[in-house]
Amino acid sequence: MKELIIPNALKRGDTIAAITLSFGSAGLFPHRYQQGVHQIEESFGVKVIPTPHALCSPADIYEHPEWRLDDMMWAFKNPDIKGIICNIGGSDTIRLLDLMTDEHFETIRNNPKIFLGISDSTINHLMCFKAGIRSYYSASLMFGYAENGGIPDIMVQNTKKTLFETTPIGELPHSDTFIIDFVDFGASEQPKRPRILTDGPRFIQGTKTVQGRLIGGCTDVLMMMAVGTKLWPAPHDFDNAILFLENSEERPSPDYMLYWMRNLGAQGILKRINGLMFSRPGNDKFTDDADKQNWLATYPKFDEVILKALKEYGRDDLPVVTNMDYGHTVPQLILPYGAMCEISCTSKRIAILESGVKERE
């Protein structure tokens, strides 16, 4: 993998830009947006400000992808902005790509700073990767950091360790519960969502300890929009990497996971990587509790198709971990692109061996 520029650490008192690069949720649900702003400011001692168009209506955001790109450049160029967080994901960030020139990528590269996002923001992470800077796969402002009842403590501690400290991140913790139910951003009351017990990460294949630099994102976005574009990483960027993947809330089935895995195999990516990590599959479209239980019962089926595809492509030796705390369920740990990660199949341990950020010069 190519070497990435590492952004400076955050400090209390810093200003963070909240940006809308896909769906205009912040303009549609201002109370949810403000809840996320308040919880981030209270938990980390930073100031959150919107980019110029971040609070526009969904219709205006959709009609003006150039506004979104302008906001992204504004945030990277502004020396007072020390970090950028996406308000939410969506489905059309890819429309910004047609507007981007070499100058836009140079702006990102010449102004490295923390960039946070999830889901459709995978496209923006690939923009940062192409520009040559580290970005951070994380919760968004309105999903995760705006969680009802406060940001989960495991996320607060992980965010501080990853973005505010310059010592190695170390072993990734795991939560004994997770949240998957739909949250109505527009509801007048925002009660705590129910938690589901979990045993934590599942080490479903592999017998050794491996290391590799992190690369990945939302599988739906990677395999249905990014692949084949100029954002798709070069083959050598997957060499000896640890690939992290996660499914969106659109509830793609295990069959889709099998198709996507076969695509990775056909590209030769599965043969290049040192390890593979998956979050819990997301889904916020339950019709009732029985539907939710049926969905949770599919988790082992995802494991089965992952192993099936790996066997088809001769990688039944590859260390694989599923059921991890990132992606479209809460809590969501931060995964820094390009950071050296270690998977130990014997000790059932995942660690990031270096710091997420660097000291300010």
Describe the function of each predicted region.
Residues 254-361:
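C-terminal active-site/capping subdomain that shapes the small-molecule cofactor and substrate pocket
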Residues 214-254:
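Oxyanion-binding "anion nests"
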Residues 1-80:
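ATP/NTP phosphate-donor binding region
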